[in-house]
Every structure is written in structure tokens, then in C-alpha cells.
């Protein structure tokens, strides 16, 4: 069983939850990512929403792999190029862009219960391998596949975590850019 806890600053009604908008990034080591990907896509047996002392079975919830549809490509492609070629090319160049999973099949619940914390419990039809170490960083929210397609150098920036956005400037060594 994998249990993921969520906490909100505001009270939420269970009936307002829309988990279909959740996308997870598998952010562990390669082996753990591959095992989680396999188990979440193939061996997921049941999903439960836990709110306080109440348990809601979510029978239609599953995971959908991200990165295979044309609109999910991370590189520009012409519309007449083969989708299979694009997927292979991107997988070999940027395998992490295929480490995303969407929750699908969540139906609104008819409950007036409100909460600021809830959990999702994922049960599997077989146990995860004993050498798979699932830590907090294994399933991440708010991640996007980002690839720098800019063909020029930029000035260095200091990523100290003090800001959420950084201005990137072209290199002063090449003023023609």
C-alpha cells in the first residue's frame, strides 16, 4: 500500500474534490521509478480516499501515462511526422518526460464532509519488490517536463531557492544575440 497525504490551507468539501487534475511525476531513482510506473499502471488493485475516519472507495480510478499523445510532445514536430518516431526520439533523448502519470476516472463524491487534510491509498494486487524504496520524493506534484530549446548561451543565474521565477538574459559575451 502506498499512502499519499494532502493538506490544504483552506477547508474543502469532499464533493468539490476533483482528483482528475492530479498529475504525478516519478522523482525517485531510475529503478524505483520503473517499479512504481509498472505497479501503478499494471498492478493497481484499489484506490481509497481517506478523510478523517471515513473511507471512500474509488473503483474507477487508475493512472494514465503521459507523453504519448501528440499534444504532450516536448519537442516541436511537423504534423505529418510519425507519432511513433516522435515518441521513440523523445524517450531516448528525454526519458524523464515519460515519468508523469495522470489520475483518471475520479467521479465526484456526494458527501457534505469538509476537510483540510485527506489521503489517497493505493493498494496493489502484488507487493512491491522489497528493494524498491518509496520515499516522499518518489511521487511529486507541480512538475512539468522542461527542455531548453534556446540555441544560445545565457548569463549564469544563482538558483538559491529564494525565488520561484528567474529572468534569463542572453550572454553578454555574444551581444549579437
What function would you assign to each model-found segment?
Residues 5, 11-177:
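Short, low-complexity Pro/Thr/Gly
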Amino acid at each position: 500500500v502506498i499512502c499519499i497525504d494532502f493538506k490544504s490551507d483552506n477547508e474543502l468539501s469532499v464533493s468539490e474534490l476533483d482528483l482528475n487534475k492530479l498529475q504525478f511525476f516519478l522523482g525517485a531513482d531510475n529503478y524505483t521509478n520503473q517499479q512504481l510506473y509498472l505497479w501503478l499502471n499494471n498492478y493497481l488493485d484499489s484506490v481509497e480516499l481517506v478523510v478523517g475516519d471515513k473511507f471512500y472507495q474509488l473503483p474507477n480510478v487508475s493512472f494514465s501515462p503521459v507523453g504519448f499523445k501528440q499534444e504532450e510532445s516536448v519537442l516541436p514536430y511537423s504534423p505529418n511526422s510519425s507519432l511513433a518516431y516522435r515518441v521513440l526520439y523523445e524517450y531516448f533523448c528525454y526519458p524523464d518526460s515519460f515519468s508523469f502519470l495522470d489520475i483518471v476516472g475520479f467521479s465526484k463524491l456526494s458527501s457534505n464532509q469538509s476537510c483540510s487534510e485527506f489521503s489517497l491509498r493505493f493498494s496493489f494486487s502484488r507487493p512491491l519488490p522489497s528493494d524498491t524504496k518509496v520515499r516522499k520524493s518518489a511521487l511529486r506534484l507541480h512538475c512539468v517536463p522542461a527542455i531548453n530549446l534556446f540555441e544560445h548561451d545565457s548569463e549564469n543565474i544563482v538558483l538559491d531557492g529564494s525565488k520561484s521565477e528567474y529572468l534569463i538574459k542572453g550572454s553578454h559575451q555574444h551581444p549579437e544575440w
